[in-house]
Design a protein with these regions (language model features):
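Terminal alpha-helical segments
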Residues: 1-129
Length: 129
């Protein structure tokens, strides 16, 4: 199955942008961009399967939607999604919740987003066969 290219391009741009921000030390934006990239990848897969995408930023909900469509996301992806989801809001509103954005957290968020992207690409390739 072919993932919608404009969704994948935007997600890949965000991942590349996050890598640059990681090197610049702008850790809060890395976490936000990682969450957004993961969200775009998950929605791209749902869109490819159904022709529609959900209106949510909750990555766990998106994984549950994929499970309901017959795919089986591995358990660790749920943990990654749960860790990434709050950064959609927390990274954009300083002082809302006490989060210390540092390199370690930013690297984890980027790794989690890459793992979600990898899984989405694998699933799209499997469905194509």
């Amino acid at each position: 199955m072919r993932l919608p290219p404009e969704w994948v391009e935007r997600a890949e741009f965000l991942l590349r942008d996050a890598e640059g921000h990681l090197e610049e030390g702008v850790y809060w934006i890395v976490c936000f961009e990682a969450q957004q990239a993961a969200e775009l990848y998950l929605k791209a897969l749902i869109l490819a399967l159904t022709g529609l995408h959900p209106y949510t930023h909750d990555l766990v909900e998106l994984l549950e939607s994929l499970r309901d469509l017959g795919l089986e996301p591995p358990e660790e992806l749920y943990a990654y999604a749960d860790a990434l989801t709050p950064h959609y809001t927390m990274s954009r509103y300083p002082g809302r919740k006490p989060v210390v954005y540092n390199r370690g957290l930013a690297e984890r968020c980027l790794r989690y987003a890459r793992e979600i992207a990898r899984w989405v690409k694998e699933k799209a390739a499997e469905v194509q066969r």
